[in-house]
């Protein structure tokens, strides 16, 4: 059972009770603390010396209900995703991606993640990708897919330290930790790199802001997802004239767009 405590305050909640603490999900000014055990008493004690912080809500939920995921393996393109290294008997050639979602997003089941995996499978199967950049790494599933598909180096960026912690565990479990570097950041402006491949699967406000900023244009091949079909034309406008749309992969109403430099 996960115990989730919602705190409201400014800055970062430091020196929290660490016994049973799985991680912290930041959505400033709210911070969600995930514990494996009942921790209300030590948290209330922590709050006594911090008058600027409030406990605004708490939730108890089964661990497997955080993402409401089921455990059957999924085959997408050249990948097989699940909690087991054994591929399905009828698809023995698939690359296995072992994923424990922990308490962050990115199990491989969301339609946008599926679309990105299909796009990665397609692009890496026809192009040599040396360096890949995954913006919004989550559990690391897309970064791991890039490494397994042949990228020599993958830079995975996320603003959430809990996501990076989980991504690192998953990278190690998949034997690609030596090719994936994890960076805590919320924008691309702090980097000066020219990757062969760039993938971004995030919510629309962040996608729009990132596309407008323009650093993603340093890449040669691009995959974008996380928006509904109503935003598709806006994405295409950001891409032109430097990039052309190679394909649009749709999964349950969620498009994944693949772009290449013209």
What spans do the regions from the language model cover?
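N-terminal auxiliary segments of SAM/dcSAM-dependent transferases
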Residues: 1-90
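S-adenosylmethionine
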Residues: 159-262
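Structural motif
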Residues: 95, 131, 196-197
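A short helix-to-beta-strand connector/capping loop
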Residues: 54, 77, 93, 152, ...
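Conserved SAM/SAH cofactor-binding pocket of Class I
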Residues: 109-187
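SAM-dependent Rossmann-like transferase core, predominantly class I methyltransferases
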Residues: 66-126
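Short beta-strand micro-motifs in enzyme catalytic cores
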Residues: 3, 31, 95, 255-258
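Conserved beta-strand termini and adjacent loop/short-helix elements that scaffold enzyme active sites
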Residues: 58-59, 82-84, 100, 183-185, ...
